[in-house]
Amino acid sequence: MRRSFALVLVAALAFAAAGCGGSSKKSSEGTTSTSCDKGDLNLVNAGELTVGTDNPAYPPWFGGKEKAPWKVSDPRSGEGFESAVAYAVADKLGFAKSEVKWIVVPFNTSFAPGPKKFDFDVNEISFTPARAKVVDFSDSYYNVNQAIVVKKGTKIANAKSVAELKPYKLGVQIGTTSYQYIKDNIKPSKQPAVYDTNDAAVAALKNGQTDALVVDLPTAFYVTAAQVPNSKILGQFPTSASGEHFGLVFQKGNSLVR
């Protein structure tokens, strides 16, 4: 994980440098660094960087103790994968931690068409061609697979292939690539149970309303460790040749990303 984290920061910082407008200076060691004039950046609120994410804010993407208005974790802590990425980008753009403002943006709202209240959103949002028609994405900061979570001791827990998943009721959050994977690849005989939030989908599995939950792999680890007792990751699904990856989301045409 440490090597992956280093790579993600490199990708995030490379994106940030692109938004700086090219101002640079040479150090005594002969290396060139990029600096930003915050006044030249196209920001929602002058003088501060506004970052959106959903609430609750879950590990491993966010850390720190719960603090209002945030539930479970606190994006402002700088702890957790996505919080650290956001602050690394902010630092490269010339913002101190105190100049970063976090706002609550529901998952499906983040990549919907129209004006945005954030400069960028970080919330495990996978790049898809359809989404890229209405919002802009940064380069990948995390490559991901989809996974399936089941309760131990259930019939579906013995499944060993995608074909064996077809008879079961699968739960998933609406608007996600997890939902798209179910439709395009698993193609179950029963309509999947679709929920507005991942919390609701998790609760359905926990309460026995669904047989399994499809989510991205890091989320699956959190679900099995902290949310659904006596559950396990049944397996992870292979991705397409191009793979699935998360990117920072921007309003379409935002000059911060190009």
Question: In which residue ranges do the predicted regions lie?
Answer:
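Bacterial lipoprotein signal-peptidase II cleavage site
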Residues: 17-31
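Periplasmic-binding protein-like
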Residues: 142-150, 218, 225-258
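Acidic, polar ligand-binding/catalytic clefts
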Residues: 98-164
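A ligand-binding cleft/hinge motif common to bilobed small-molecule-binding domains
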Residues: 109, 125-134, 183-184, 206, ...
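Hydrophobic residues within well-ordered alpha-helices
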Residues: 89, 113-115, 165, 204-206, ...
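Extended ligand-binding regions for polar small-molecule ligands
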Residues: 85-87, 92, 154, 169, ...
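Sec-dependent bacterial lipoprotein signal peptides
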Residues: 1-18
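Extracytoplasmic small-molecule ligand-binding "clamshell" domains
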Residues: 31-121
